[in-house]
Amino acid sequence: MGSLSIWHWIVVIGVVLLLFGRGKISDLMGDVAQGIKSFKKGLQDDEKTAEKPEPVKSIDHTAPPAAAPRTDVGSKVV
């Protein structure tokens, strides 16, 4: 009951051929193959760009010189 016999597959293939026709199925398979090729080409292009790492930028961690204490010109200390 759970497995499909050869007759089930023949009926399914026959229905698919009747619905889509031989020409549409071959065109569809050609489009699928072309899509797979372009996908693989895209993966290879990504790998080529990943092989060229960007130069590492270093950050200088030295502290800036300490600022002199500020005094307000308008206020006077008594």
Curated annotation (Swiss-Prot):
Q: Which Gene3D superfamilies match?
A: 1.20.5.3310
What GO terms in the biological process aspect are recorded for it? protein transport by the Tat complex
User: Where in the cell is the protein located?
Assistant: Cell inner membrane
Could you give a GO molecular-function term held by this entry? Answer: protein transmembrane transporter activity
Q: How does it sit in the membrane?
A: Single-pass membrane protein
Its transmembrane ranges are: 1-21
Question: InterPro entries annotated for this entry?
Answer: TatA/B/E (IPR003369), TatA/E (IPR006312)
Where are the stretches annotated Disordered?
Answer: 42-78
Q: Where is the composition biased (Basic and acidic residues)?
A: 42-60
Naming one, the record's GO cellular component terms include: TAT protein transport complex
Main subcellular location of this protein, as a coarse class: membrane
Q: Does this entry carry the keyword Protein transport? A: yes
Identify the keywords attached in UniProt to this record, alphabetized: Cell inner membrane, Cell membrane, Membrane, Protein transport, Translocation, Transmembrane, Transmembrane helix, Transport
Quick check: keyword Cell inner membrane in the entry? yes
Quaternary structure note: The Tat system comprises two distinct complexes: a TatABC complex, containing multiple copies of TatA, TatB and TatC subunits, and a separate TatA complex, containing only TatA subunits. Substrates initially bind to the TatABC complex, which probably triggers association of the separate TatA complex to form the active translocon.
**What role does it play?**
Part of the twin-arginine translocation (Tat) system that transports large folded proteins containing a characteristic twin-arginine motif in their signal peptide across membranes. TatA could form the protein-conducting channel of the Tat system.
Could you say which protein family the record assigns here? Belongs to the TatA/E family.
* NCBIfam families on file: PRK00720.1 (NF001940), tatAE (TIGR01411)
Put simply, this protein is called Sec-independent protein translocase protein TatA
